[in-house]
């Protein structure tokens, strides 16, 4: 055999030939090869597995090919080891022995029995029951001049399967909110894959597939075959070619991944862009919706504060709701109606929440049952959960809320199925299939008969033992069993002379002899046959029960979805009760009025000795753009986030942290809050800021809410102020979006006198003799001081630095070219770059000023003229 890259120069053993043949079919996977009681990996896979799992790397003989690297682990511990590999981003193929080694002629037959990837896993050791685990496919297409992307995604553990199409430019934001664990993409789309890998969250595995899988014909064939239909018109997806391609890719990938029956994927839904709000990456991050900006964890996020769900299904739905707020008035109001009724009926609410806490995760239980991964205990828990549905249903049927009554109608207790599960499974039995005994006595006559034979035969063996002791006068004679020799009679060496002639020797030990007799052989056959038949029949009955449950997949999934929504609504009511939230008044106007609003996260973090300062917000047709000035640490950014979170909560269907709120529906929430370098992509703070600002200006509408903080601070004062000024003009005149614009450019306060819908607000402070106190109250009017030196003092700057800063600031405010120098230091010339607009300059500038026609200047022209005047003042111009 020719020498390979891995150093094999001679003929390998038959088992290694079998291994290499399987490995060749699954080149992108770590191949776990079952050998006896172990899963073993060889060659390069062994090196990888040894390093990833921190287990011993050894070597084994490979016949004439010499020794090869080997790493392995016991099969009974495989779930934990596989979980570690998948969590680290590897794909794993499991190759099992599919015949009894004792009966094998030659090499034991082996086949791939399971494939586990980040997007295809059912293991509790990998999954978080409060998060979805999505497998996603992306299929870009070009229609004329328009570049689109078809996206499909599935959570195999919950059967959620949906698709959409969107402009290619919106793909990153969509995937960021979806956060799939694995993304399938065509080999021809290398540039797109690299772009997504750079800009998306870390942790997603990109799996490249052959081009032929990404065709409309192939997708139609796969989808129609899966859903057993000749047309996809009934699913409402006929107009979405790229989305269908992506959906077809997912199904084919799952089928090739040995996922068993996928019949529980009974429907595919469409993500309607007009129904829910799209939150871009920046908004999700800046508002800290599901993770904090500080460390990316749940701590300090909105989700952490309001997640009072009682069931994993509700927790997953709440997460999806927060990332996709509603855009239509009717569904928002219906959720508010339901929350209001649950708030006003605490006994009903707590009764519902108590029952939800006792119901199993139906979605994931169903998926494991349908794919033959469930244990008997989980199936029994599903039956017990179905048995609770009638009581829950009765609590909802008299509701005033239309949405609660609709949810009640969707709850199907499936009484016959629940009764069958109760009759079939023994509540006291072991939870594993291997141990047996889980089918209840009386459920199946043949199984009861086999168990009786087995039990009776065991009694007969005890009789044989007693009879032979009497016949032989050997009181220590024992009838025993092992897997190699079966049942035998064991006699000590000291008593071997008492053994009758009809005893047939089976084995000689150091201190004993083992025999069999005709009567023992007869009953051994009865016992083993009955036990084997009993085990096979019990397993068959369990599989039939699982198939019966899988046939009801559509009904169980509908019930699960209703339970999840009910959990979220009850969660919102609980939050409103606990935190003092109010019901917002929603309408289709463009006004936003919040009275005594609070930041939902900060108010929970602050202690009793530092109560949260509530603030009003009025923005709309008369006050369209609020310019908010004031020092750092005064609460400007928190105020912006507070307003954004109040609006988001309202459109999710939750009550809001305020005394009152009236909110005209928002179609998008855009934020630009704080610096966020993207240095790994070669983008500076300012470039990132401008990219985000440009995206906002290009996508916002009159119905959008814009929350902009410190635009332009990443560049020079002159450039930054020019950009901030120009953006305000554009938003006011062109977009007319409701906007909160926090800035340290106090010169922007001039905009109020020039534009009818721009209004100044400021974050108030109180000055004392030697310090300032930040009140964190937003009030009408502009601020005239940034108090930057006071903030530096609070941060612990050395006193001499603070004192020197005050001297320099005083000189700048007097507009001196020569500023006061430090004592015992050389004179220092400071060039002030902080330009004030519309002031008279020195007499030497009068000639230049007199030639300017102010009435014909645009704001941008005025800034350019000011730049020229500055250069004259600094001796750079004429």
From Swiss-Prot:
One BP annotation, GO: mismatch repair
Statement: the UniProt record of this protein carries the keyword Lyase: no
Matching InterPro entries: DNA_mismatch_repair_MutS, DNA_mismatch_repair_MutS-lik_N, DNA_mismatch_repair_MutS/MSH, DNA_mismatch_repair_MutS_C, DNA_mismatch_repair_MutS_clamp, DNA_mismatch_repair_MutS_core, DNA_mismatch_repair_MutS_N, DNA_mismatch_repair_MutS_sf
Positions contributing to ATP binding: 630-637
MF-aspect GO terms: ATP binding; ATP-dependent DNA damage sensor activity; damaged DNA binding; mismatched DNA binding
PROSITE patterns reported for this sequence: DNA_MISMATCH_REPAIR_2 (PS00486)
Pfam families to which the protein is assigned, alphabetical: MutS_I, MutS_II, MutS_III, MutS_IV, MutS_V
Stated family: Belongs to the DNA mismatch repair MutS family.
Reported function: This protein is involved in the repair of mismatches in DNA. It is possible that it carries out the mismatch recognition step. This protein has a weak ATPase activity.
Protein name, UniProt field: DNA mismatch repair protein MutS
Native source organism of the sequence: Chlorobaculum tepidum (strain ATCC 49652 / DSM 12025 / NBRC 103806 / TLS)
Designated gene of the protein: mutS
